[in-house]
Every structure is written in structure tokens, then in C-alpha cells.
Amino acid sequence: MNQVNAAIAAGTWPVPPVSLFSWGSNNAGQLGLGNTTYYSSPKQIGAASAWLTIAAGYAFVVSTKLDGTLWSWGANGSGQLGIGSTADKSSPNQVGALTAWLKVSAGYAHTLATKTDGTLWSWGWNAYGQLGIGSTVSKSSPNQVGALTTWSAIAAVDRHSLAVKTDGTLWSWGRNHTGQLGLGNTTYYSSPKQVGALTAWLSVAGGRYFSLAIKTDGTLWSWGGNQYGRLGLGNTTGYSSPKQVGALTNWATSSGGIFHTLATKTDGTAWAWGNGTYGSLGQNNTTYYSSPKQVGALTTWLSVTAGGYASSIAIKTDGTLWGWGNNPQGVLGRGNLTDYSSPVQLGALTSWTKAQTGHTFTVAIKT
């Protein structure tokens, strides 16, 4: 147990009240509200607690608390909730009894997580080896990926996985039919394989059949399937090894959906590219773009998340929550089912800190 977790357990750490909200589709209980009713505006999940991180998969959610515990809910047909069964859960269930979980990431139906000791764990669907455990057998409880204690950044991306180690090396495994593993081929791998020899990778992300990564120098890279230009390279050609997106060196975050990509720069601007159907790129149109286009002129964007079904959610530095694009079952949280082709604010609150969008639902943390 680290010092923060120990202080929390002892009651000496000042834990602020943090609330978790959800909205959108709820067929598998992915909203965590104890039912399967969809809601087009935010609904609070239980009482305020010490929620820390959230990760939204296709129809499930995994979340950590400040005390290091791990929780999950929603679809569980492949064991992606990690609770030792395959039954869907419509309210948060604790994953084991450990209090050392640090980071989580959710793919289509598999989950990756790191612990405070730097170990990497996985569970859920494993048909393509996306769990990285050397087999294609699905697991309903956490299994350690190798024996290393140096994992830093992770991304469970649809049907493949990406990770960065503390030495800056990049690793990938799982499905690879479009070259999304970045290994220069289309071979599937059920255990981690290093992507090139560079040691300057910082963060990873991606969408359906493609990958994104940012280096320590602020450059953005992409590879894999490139339908609709979602790689941002100015074309629709697929690549099986990393390609730099433009020449800029100030990218901060990135997020991939099924056919579109979002990113922020260190100057607070937000950018989008790929399939613009339903207005998912925030350009006030439904045009496709194969290279980055700025979303408006604001320089106050903090984070962006590209939803699976052409929706987009973003948080500004003032804590306001915004959305645009496709709005099936109210994934944009506006209380309606209307699509929007440019950013619109979700309510008037100014205390949102994190947001994640699954296929057609959203989960967010508010202080």
C-alpha cells in the first residue's frame, strides 16, 4: 500500500467528495444505476465517493478509487468486469480485495490495469490474444501480463492492446489485421512485442483497428487502418508501422473512436479528423477530413474523448463539459437525442474533471 492509500485507510488523508455520473445507452447496465434504462441527461451513480479514474469499454466501465480499489459494471459476457463470472452487473462491483490498482483501460470487451508496483494485468475477451498472456483463452479475473514491474501507460484498444514501459519503449499485442500493432506486419501476437527500438514514447491510445501514440518530444504518431483518414496523415492509406501526424511537437492528448480521432495540444486547442458523419468532428458540418482540423478557435480545452459511435465529449479548463456529434440514446447528455455538429455545453456545472465515452454512453467524474 502506497503512502496516499495508507493515509486514506487510516482516515488521515483529506479525501474530497467526488461524484460519478453516467448517461446514454444502458442495455447491459453500463450506467451503473442498478437498472437497464437509458438516460439522456447525467445521473449520479450512488453516493459521492473517492472515485479517481474511469475507463469506458463498448458497454462496460472500470474505475478506481483513491484507496486503490478497483470497481466495474456493465456488460460481462467475456469476463471483462474481472469479477470471476460472466454475468452482467448494473451497479459497481469490486474487483477482488486488493487496494493497489493505479491505472485502467477498457477495450471492446477486455480490460488492462496496472498496479502501484508497476505490474500489468488483463482480463476479458481474448480471441485475438489481446490479453497478452500468451494464449487466446478469455479470463474472467485478473491475470498478470509477464513478470515485469515497469509498465507505465496502457491502452486497451478495441481488440488489441498498447503499453509503454518506464524506459519509454512501446509494446503491442492482439489483433493486427490492419497493422494496428505497428510491427510492420499483420500477424497477431498473444504476448507483448516491442514496436521499433525507440525509447521516447509517452502515451498511447487508439480506436477500432488503429493506434495513436505521443512521444516525449510532443510529436503525434498513428498507424493501422485508415478508413476515412482517421490516422490524420492526409490520405486513406493504411500503415503497419508508426507514421508522424504532421510536424508539430505540441500534442498533449489523443483519443480514437471507430472512424474519427480527437486530440488536444499543449496550447489548449482541440483538433479532429476522420469521418465527420453526424458532426463528430465539431466542424459545423458532416465532412470527412484526413488531416487535423481545429475545433473552433478556443484555447481552453483540457481533454477530449472520441466515442465509439461518432460522438465526442470534451472538458474545458474551467471544468465545463461539452459534446458534439452523434447522440443516440442521449450519449451527449443534453436531455435529447439531437445530433450536434459543433460543441454544445452539457448543463451549467463547472466541476467536471474526467469523462470517458463508450459505444453510445458516457461516464464522468465531478468534484
Regions found by a protein language model. Give the residues of each.
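Tandem repeat domain/solenoid detector
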Residues: 52-53, 66-69, 100-105, 116-119, ...
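Enriched but not universal
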Residues: 1-23, 366-367
